[in-house]
């Protein structure tokens, strides 16, 4: 059974983001908001890798590559959010999320699900942006109609 390019690279995004955040937590930098933004680098890597694999396989249709790029980033985002939910409950649930939200853009006391849903929307928005940027970067490699 062959794993799809999108799923494989989405899992790479998930693992790299997970290792990055665990490393930040272990080094005591989990509360530094600006370091959290660097996770977009891992999304760029996974999406770019998916497009490179598609181009190497001779898939040069712009739309199918855009869908592939978007699916790759969304798989990475969804897996990362699921990982965050599991990790948050392991670390104490709502109390853990409230300690995170002190350095994030929340007011009040968000629950694990509120925090995760807001990060899901942020992740979907960043997936669209990353997909557009990577597709623009590789634009000259695709067939013109």
Label each residue range with its predicted role.
Residues 9, 13, 40, 64, ...:
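Alpha-helical transmembrane segments of multi-pass membrane proteins, especially transporters
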Residues 109-130:
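Hydrophobic alpha-helical transmembrane segments
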Residues 136-145:
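Cytoplasmic juxtamembrane regions at transmembrane-helix boundaries
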Residues 44-71:
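Cytoplasmic juxtamembrane interface segments
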Residues 14-18, 44, 77, 81, ...:
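Transmembrane alpha-helical segments of multi-pass membrane transport proteins and ion-pumping complexes
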Residues 83-103:
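Functional transmembrane-helix hotspots
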Residues 1-54:
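Transmembrane alpha-helical insertion/packing segments
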Residues 69-87:
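Hydrophobic alpha-helical membrane-insertion segments
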